[in-house]
Amino acid sequence: KLHITANKLTANVNTFGTSEHKVQTEIQTLDLESAKNVYMNQKADLKVEKLKANETIDLQAKDTTIKEMSGKDIKLDVGNLSLGTIKATEKIELKVLGNVTGDEREGYHLETPVLDKAEITGGFGTLDQPIKTNIDVINSIVSRNSDICIFNNLDKTLTINTIEAANGWIQLVAGEIIINHLLSKNLSISTEGDLTLDDLNIYERVILNIGGNVQVIQSTHNSLTAQMLNGNIRGFFGTSEMPIRLKTDCISLVANNDIYTTSLKNTDDGQDYIVDQLVSNNGDVVFEHVDSSVNINNMKGTNVTLKNNDDIIAHMIEAKETLFIKTPQSFKSIDEDGSIKVEKLIINAGKKVKVVNGDVENAEIYVNDGTIDFINNLDKDITVNLEAKEDINVTLGNTVIEKIYTDGNIDLNAKDVAVQNDKLHIKANKLTAKVNTFGASE
């Protein structure tokens, strides 16, 4: 039955209700302190000026505005929830039929070691005004119809076991973040330190701004699924032992250190996988793809390894040392505005290799069942080791030939051509050459 009706209830008690028999109220404003517990069922909207208990707070109400609340374990079941600050020394549990919003403040809206369970019908914060938290662990937070936006204490590592906003954005800001399961329409993560992830499923776009490293909990399955991944990583992105396994359609990512990633195509639409950019400023790039052709706009690193089971089309690839490419199909760099700029180029292809604007010092190209077409910077001295089943057509500057072998024909345009030993250098059906010099007396 209804026990208390009033405009405002001010109380200082030892206990206020029990778990079996909650105090039934219909008041407008609450100012309550309890030495132990508070069990309360409010029949209408409620404004909490202060609610303090040393042990449990279990509150049911309609739309609720909280200025100040503190306890050991706090459980709220309300309509809309407007937050000032809630502090729990052990855990908080929320069930909200509307939205969770926070006021403008310097401090935190939620402070607790564990946000045990949060079921939100609407949104949890907004993109412009996230919920400010001081939390160690989120066991589960789910928004059914809107966004989840959290700004956690930047000095803490936030561990998230489950977070879902299938119809909205998830926006996370924290010191470091560990995520075991995530589901959302769009995702934005910013950290001061590392991001450790597993089982992230995003329908559309992911934006990462990571102050440390990105690593995975395990590499036996796809760690991140999305249509588009954008990233700015100040550390590394994956390792050789634990590469980041992606299922995406497009990637644009810059890291200061190494990048190790393997990928599948997310959408089975017959289109190329797009690498808008995959750049390591100070480390290596290792990119493996398995189930579609790949179109590369910009890829850069100290050493770059590129493997694919289908065709590779490249606009710009730059490696300070070695570029290694492997495909059972074809590799093409046919854009004259682009370039393959490397110290050493190694290509192992099945059907065809075509490079129209190379800037290469040493080229080793092997084509099992096709042709080689290679145009290098005429001002660049180059050493070549070329082998193909069919014709080889090259335009080069000063050239040292280790070998050029083919069952077809060779068309060689170069400046000075030299060799460094007495081994067999050229093998072909027909050699057509236009050069300044061809060998030397020595």
Question: What feature does the model see in each segment?
Answer:
Residues K1-E442:
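Extracellular lectin-like interaction modules
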